[in-house]
């Protein structure tokens, strides 16, 4: 009868809806777990770096010393750069990064970016062949959010290019590059004007002159 047919149809629809909801919950649950585990990896890595802050840095900058003259020139250049920073009142935050351990976590880690006042305190990676790899993959190789902070292979790992583009997700939980939105506030912009990039050989200081979306 039409009534029985309608009732059977309603039961079928409810069953289909239940299956769809279960599938959606599984997908979102898996995505949430991947993101949570990846964030734990970052927190663990940051904790390891912080634990080293009061220890002696086992990776002091090695100045080339092929000749006495070359050594003196390099030392003079470093002293000049330090003097310029002092004149601007810039004090570089100390990060005793253990590059051997960082490479043990992921061979593609080649720098560390730190922006005071934000949550940006992460390793920087560069995949040797796939520019978008770390958009979708985490440091431990799992696929999903939050991915990694990374540059494309067109940019030098020495940060010698005229422009270096650093990529990172705008996460809703305020991790990765989400906290850069703080620079929409002029007071915050004025209070935190510098970006620090650490490599095995040097520390680079960038002054922020503009922020927009």
Residue spans of the language-model regions?
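Hydrophobic H-region at the start of alpha-helical membrane spans
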Residues: 10-22
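Single conserved hydrophobic/aromatic residue that forms the stacking wall/gate
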Residues: 1-8, 12
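Solvent-exposed, non-transmembrane regions of membrane-associated and secreted proteins
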Residues: 21-213
């Amino acid at each position: 009868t039409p009534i029985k047919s309608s009732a059977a149809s309603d039961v079928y629809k409810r069953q289909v809806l239940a299956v769809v909801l279960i599938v959606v919950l599984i997908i979102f649950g898996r995505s949430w777990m991947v993101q949570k585990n990846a964030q734990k990896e970052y927190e663990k890595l940051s904790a390891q770096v912080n634990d080293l802050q009061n220890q002696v840095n086992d990776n002091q900058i090695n100045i080339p010393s092929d000749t006495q003259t070359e050594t003196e020139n390099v030392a003079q250049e470093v002293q000049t750069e330090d003097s310029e920073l002092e004149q601007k009142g810039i004090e570089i935050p100390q990060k005793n990064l253990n590059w051997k351990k960082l490479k043990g976590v992921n061979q593609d880690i080649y720098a560390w970016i730190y922006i005071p006042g934000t949550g940006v305190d992460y390793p920087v990676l560069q995949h040797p062949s796939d520019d978008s790899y770390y958009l979708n993959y985490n440091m431990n190789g799992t696929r999903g959010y939050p991915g990694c902070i990374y540059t494309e292979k067109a940019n030098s790992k020495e940060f010698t290019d005229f422009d270096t583009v650093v990529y990172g997700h705008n996460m809703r939980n305020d991790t990765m590059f989400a906290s850069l939105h703080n620079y929409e506030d002029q007071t915050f912009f004025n209070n935190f004007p510098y970006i620090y990039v650490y490599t095995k050989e040097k520390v680079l200081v960038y002054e922020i002159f503009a922020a927009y979306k």
